[in-house]
Amino acid sequence: MTQTGSARFEGDSWDLASSVGLTATMVAAARAVAGRAPGALVNDQFAEPLVRAVGVDFFVRMASGELDPDELAEDEANGLRRFADAMAIRTHYFDNFFLDATRAGIRQAVILASGLDSRAYRLRWPAGTIVFEVDQPQVIDFKTTTLAGLGAAPTTDRRTVAVDLRDDWPTALQKAGFDNAQRTAWIAEGLLGYLSAEAQDRLLDQITAQSVPGSQFATEVLRDINRLNEEELRGRMRRLAERFRRHGLDLDMSGLVYFGDRTDARTYLADHGWRTASASTTDLLAEHGLPPIDGDDAPFGEVIYVSAELKQKHQDTR
């Protein structure tokens, strides 16, 4: 059985085959599955080779199509299809966010906790756009080396910032050439649930401090990751872990996310000068003709996608 070292602790670190890093591999595998669907919403040609390079057998088989849903138990097959659907609409949402931001004239993009994100290689960026990728050093190094080995080249000026988001990443970002006097498009995709309430607020403070009016930001709100729903969601995550264990993978999401009450990112953003818009997973699935996801196939509950534009910077933001 593949051991992932799931338990979180202060100052923990990971690679793409363990702990929080393994979730990036899981999501990339789902992007590969989603890309094979009829009328696919996403086309991430780098997802499968990156997952293969990480080498976690279950996700390699999933990404390559060797893990045929028809050969799985009914709950596993449906769960795999629905997870791929969820990641398709998520990827499509953040892809479009960046494309819309560049159409609005923004030429500076930041991907926080970039993991196996390949947007700097697969999206069509306008000339002069700089894309900054921020993640732990071993994650950045692995992806850069792997894609170079595949002969892939970025489609824009890609700059890597090898730093933990719990450290002084704004300084590292500026050293890489980030200009906080220019409008920026930021994404924190699949990130906030893996931060404590305090770390989430600090990250949002830092993003706001590094933004000028006209900057844009997109993320997700895990509406149900709170004390009220903790028991139910932990149960869903444990049952998902049992599905994984049937295939030799030890990954328990309940040991990776931070439960408990936290500020809703929409409330934070509105209180700090951002104008927000949001759409639920259910809304986005329906928009693309896909059925809703619920029960054990929604281990995080209802996910809300949020985009925001900074209208007026408040004086108390540091």
UniProtKB/Swiss-Prot annotation:
Domain of life where this protein originates: Bacteria
State any single GO MF term: methyltransferase activity
Q: Which InterPro entries does the protein's record reference?
A: Ppm1/Ppm2/Tcmp (IPR007213), SAM-dependent_MTases_sf (IPR029063), SAM_mthyl_Trfase_ML2640-like (IPR011610)
- Tell me a GO biological process for this protein: methylation
Cross-referenced SUPFAM superfamilies, in alphabetical order? Answer: S-adenosyl-L-methionine-dependent methyltransferases
Its keywords, alphabetically, are:
Methyltransferase, S-adenosyl-L-methionine, Transferase
Q: Which Gene3D superfamilies match?
A: Vaccinia Virus protein VP39
EC number of the protein:
2.1.1.-
A Pfam family of the record is: LCM
- Name the enzyme group at the top EC level: transferase
Q: Which residues bind S-adenosyl-L-methionine?
A: 135, 164-165
State the family named in the UniProt similarity comment for this chain.
Belongs to the UPF0677 family.
Its job: Exhibits S-adenosyl-L-methionine-dependent methyltransferase activity.
> Which protein are we looking at?
Putative S-adenosyl-L-methionine-dependent methyltransferase Rv0731c
Native species: Mycobacterium tuberculosis (strain ATCC 25618 / H37Rv)
